[in-house]
Regions:
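Rossmann-like NAD(P)H-binding beta-loop-alpha module
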Residues: 112-193, 200
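ATP-dependent carboxylate/acyl-activation modules
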Residues: 264-334, 338
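N-terminal glycine-/serine-/threonine-rich beta1-alpha1-beta2 phosphate-ribose binding loop
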Residues: 1-87
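Substrate-binding/catalytic subdomain of NAD(P)-dependent oxidoreductase enzymes
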Residues: 170-268, 273-275
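Rossmann-fold NAD(P)-binding glycine/threonine-rich loop
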Residues: 72-88, 95-136
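A short hydrophobic/small-residue beta-strand
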Residues: 91-93, 366
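A conserved regulatory-domain signal marking ACT and ACT-like small-molecule sensing domains
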Residues: 306-420
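Generic hydrophobic/aromatic pocket-lining and core-packing "Φ" positions
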Residues: 56, 82-86, 108, 228, ...
Length: 420
């Protein structure tokens, strides 16, 4: 059992939660140190039994501290604090997915060298918890694929657009007002946050290094109400998915908007909730659902990791990197998928024949085609789904359509994922 104090970098989230308040009693923590920018500021939780300091290095260098909880976020200070703490022989618990996605390999290597624990359940969909499921619950399985909704902000936006027919910008403003999206929402709406998380899940699932830089990443900022209406008519829901999949010559790592059949359970996951589907050789397909962010979800995962250390559990999030297999990441152009395309074309005689002719020229079969009524500008809205084809081929089709005399707007392309 950990008998020495625990250092908490970043106080508000964990201390204000129910799980965080249980920390000192359930786990017999002797004391809790927290670095704060202003230790005289009024807090939303009781800090009377907590030793406060404005200098985080005072605590990571303190000889009587066993465990460091890093909850401040970012790359610079957080990385320096964690490196210092590890070198001083302290166990690490963090919720910092961006830091792990960009620097996790070197930090894990350092933790292994110093023989300390480096745990980060809260970094990905903290309320599920998916990392322990992959490492422990599915340890008898070979993981074939991981696919999920791992950013609650994006899921909230897409859900509201579908349910209320609102446009993207309008829902984004509401998400910011509700605190679901940051003032600068780039990480959430452009898929960067989800890509950080996917790179972590893939490394654990497949026993590789973290490869955030190789994740194909596309956000939801260009999804329109027209896309959602067409998808609904075709029997699909648009979800922003992170997908890691074993294929014959490597693994696919991709984050992008995806049409998912309404028959799939994951299509029913709405609002800020997260869900991850895992396909494995023994168990088959399993679904893990729960809140991915917020005070309680983060604190629940952080305190669970703390329990593991205090109770001397053998699980360690560094296990997935021991083999560090060299697995090729498939280039996005080579990935095969079914696709949805939305076109805006002039309503002239023979236009449908010209459109389908472009698909025929590329040897691509059309699975479904919907033409909506002509708008006030005498343009026709067309939605098409294809059979399985490479991304490179469908991008060539897009280029050919956009170069035609009848095209009136950029062609929208969205993956269709069967998740079978």
């Amino acid at each position: 059992m950990c008998k020495n104090p625990i250092e908490l970098s970043g106080l508000a989230t964990s201390c204000s939660s129910k799980s965080g308040k249980k920390c000192t009693t359930r786990n017999q923590v002797v004391a809790l140190s927290s670095d704060l920018r202003n230790k005289t500021k009024k807090r939303i939780c009781d800090t009377s039994d907590i030793k406060l300091t404005e200098d985080p290095f005072e605590v990571v260098n303190h000889p009587d501290i066993d465990v460091v909880l890093e909850l401040i976020g970012g790359f610079g200070l957080a990385k320096e604090l964690i490196e210092t703490a590890i070198r001083n022989g302290k166990h690490i618990i963090t919720a910092n997915k961006a830091l792990i996605g960009n620097h996790g390999n070197e930090l894990i290597k350092l933790a292994n060298k110093k023989e300390v624990r480096f745990l980060f359940e809260a970094s990905v969909a903290g309320g599920i918890p998916i990392i322990k499921a992959l490492e422990q619950g599915l340890s008898a399985n070979n993981i074939e694929s991981v696919a999920g909704i791992i950013n609650g902000t994006g899921n909230f936006i897409l859900t509201d657009m579908k349910e209320k027919g609102r446009d993207f910008d309008d829902v984004l403003k509401e998400a910011q007002a509700l605190g679901y999206a940051e003032e600068d929402p780039t990480f959430d709406i452009e898929g960067i946050d989800a890509a950080h998380k996917l790179s972590i899940l893939a490394a654990i699932a497949f026993g590789t290094k973290i490869q955030f830089d190789k994740v194909y990443t596309k956000g939801i900022s260009d999804i329109t109400t027209e896309d959602i209406l067409h998808a609904t008519e075709l029997g699909y829901t648009i979800k922003h998915l992170g997908i890691a999949k074993r294929v014959e010559n490597g693994i696919e790592l991709r984050v992008h908007p995806t049409l998912v059949s309404n028959k799939q359970l994951i299509a029913q996951v709405d609002g800020v909730m997260n869900a991850v589907m895992v396909k494995s050789d023994a168990l088959g397909t399993s679904l893990y659902y729960g809140p991915g962010a917020g005070d309680e979800a983060t604190a629940s995962a952080v305190i669970a990791d703390l329990n593991d250390i205090i109770n001397n559990q053998t699980s360690n999030h560094t296990l997935g990197w021991k083999s560090q297999q060299k697995i090729n990441v498939i280039d996005n152009d080579s990935i095969n998928s079914e696709f949805f395309l939305r076109l805006l074309v002039s309503d002239v005689k023979g236009v449908l024949s010209k459109v389908t002719g472009i698909f025929n020229d590329h040897n691509v079969s059309i699975e479904a085609l919907i033409q909506k009524q002509v708008d006030e500008n005498k343009n026709a809205h067309i939605a098409i789904t294809t059979d399985r084809v490479s991304t490179k081929t469908v991008m060539s089709i897009k280029a050919a359509i956009e170069a035609s005399e009848f095209n009136q707007a950029d062609v929208q392309i969205i993956h269709i994922e069967l998740l079978d």
